């Protein structure tokens, strides 16, 4: 049994196995209807609980479709259904769910909820997102980069904007996959120093550059994310916009990267805030391949967790 809680907690050889498996499974589905089953049915007779304390479009749909394609069934539970930690303890919830289902995916706010769920569950637990990390997204991003440009090892990735949970998982991935990462953004939104040092301890170059034009020079991949939550108050949105406007990814900024550089954004996006529509819809953008690859990467993660 394998939990998938964070990239830095997973052996590099296992991460490579997941990426390679995802690529094989994606290739095998070419030309098939979305609802057609995979040739192999590794999740036949398996039930996967999908827990959403924090709502999502991509995570819910991609996991649900992936389970169905592999022959399994899903049980979707919202925060209102569960009330995690506000009645029954998380530990007891984990123990009970483990008697009903074969795998648990949880998308939550507090990483401590994820950690406790994994500690007491007797089935694998997958981190669908926390406020601290988002490893499934980065596995999809690496799959996307490698299908367009080959191995990511030794490449330069630039993160522009807020050093948030997706940025944190990119830092973890840098150490495990062997690519360099430059963060460019305001000092008040720097990524967690603990994550920076962890990546550096693996021998990769992690740099902080306040000037975005300098940061993206020679980049193989430029990545950003939404500046504000879709649910943030207007005052918070205005404050973040003032801080982050210099770090918007536009055509002028992308021109400083390598000509073959790719652009990624995990979506949803506030178009023309963190990135211009010109870039998002341009030839260097792979944002919709990236979104599709959530499906394939997560299918491979589930197979790895269950060893099927």
UniProtKB/Swiss-Prot annotation:
Domain of life of the source: Bacteria
InterPro entries reported in the protein's UniProt record: Asp/Orn_carbamoyltranf_P-bd, Asp/Orn_carbamoylTrfase, Asp/Orn_carbamoylTrfase_sf, Asp_carbamoyltransf_Asp/Orn-bd, Orn/put_carbamltrans, OTCase_ArgI
Binding-site positions, carbamoyl phosphate: 56-59, 83, 107, 134-137, 266-267, 294
Pfam families for the chain: OTCace (PF00185), OTCace_N (PF02729)
Main location: cytoplasm
NCBIfam families xrefs: orni_carb_tr, PRK00779.1
HAMAP family documented for this protein: OTCase
Protein's job: Reversibly catalyzes the transfer of the carbamoyl group from carbamoyl phosphate (CP) to the N(epsilon) atom of ornithine (ORN) to produce L-citrulline.
Protein name per Swiss-Prot or TrEMBL: Ornithine carbamoyltransferase
Annotated source species: Roseobacter denitrificans (strain ATCC 33942 / OCh 114) (Erythrobacter sp. (strain OCh 114))
Upper classification of the organism: Bacteria, Pseudomonadati, Pseudomonadota, Alphaproteobacteria, Rhodobacterales
Gene name tied to this protein: argF
């Amino acid at each position: 049994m394998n939990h998938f809680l964070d990239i830095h907690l997973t052996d590099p050889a296992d991460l490579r196995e997941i990426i390679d498996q995802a690529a094989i499974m994606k290739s095998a589905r070419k030309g098939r209807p979305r609802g057609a089953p995979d040739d192999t049915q590794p999740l036949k007779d398996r039930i996967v609980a999908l827990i959403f304390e924090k709502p999502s479009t991509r995570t819910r749909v991609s996991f649900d479709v992936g389970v169905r394609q592999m022959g399994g069934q899903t049980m979707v539970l919202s925060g209102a259904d569960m009330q995690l930690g506000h009645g029954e303890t998380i530990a007891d919830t984990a123990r009970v769910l483990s008697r009903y289902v074969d795998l648990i995916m949880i998308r939550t706010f507090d990483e401590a909820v994820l950690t406790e769920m994994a500690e007491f569950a007797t089935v694998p637990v997958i981190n669908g997102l926390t406020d601290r990390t988002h490893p499934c997204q980065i596995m999809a991003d690496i799959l996307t980069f490698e299908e367009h440009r080959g191995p990511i090892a030794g490449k330069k990735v630039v993160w522009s904007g807020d050093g948030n949970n997706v940025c944190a998982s990119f830092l973890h991935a840098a150490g495990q996959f062997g690519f360099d990462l430059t963060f460019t953004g305001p000092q008040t939104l720097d990524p967690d120093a603990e994550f920076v040092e962890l990546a550096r301890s693996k021998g990769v170059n992690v740099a902080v550059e306040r000037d975005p034009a300098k940061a993206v020079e020679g980049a193989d991949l430029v990545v950003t994310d939404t500046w504000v939550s879709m649910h943030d108050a207007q005052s918070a949105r205005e404050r973040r916009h003032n801080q982050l406007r210099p770090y918007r990814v536009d055509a002028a900024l992308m021109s400083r990267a390598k000509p073959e550089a790719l652009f990624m954004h995990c979506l949803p996006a506030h178009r023309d805030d963190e990135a211009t529509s010109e870039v998002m819809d341009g030839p260097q953008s792979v944002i919709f391949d990236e979104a599709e690859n959530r499906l394939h990467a997560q299918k491979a993660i589930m197979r790895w967790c269950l060893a099927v």
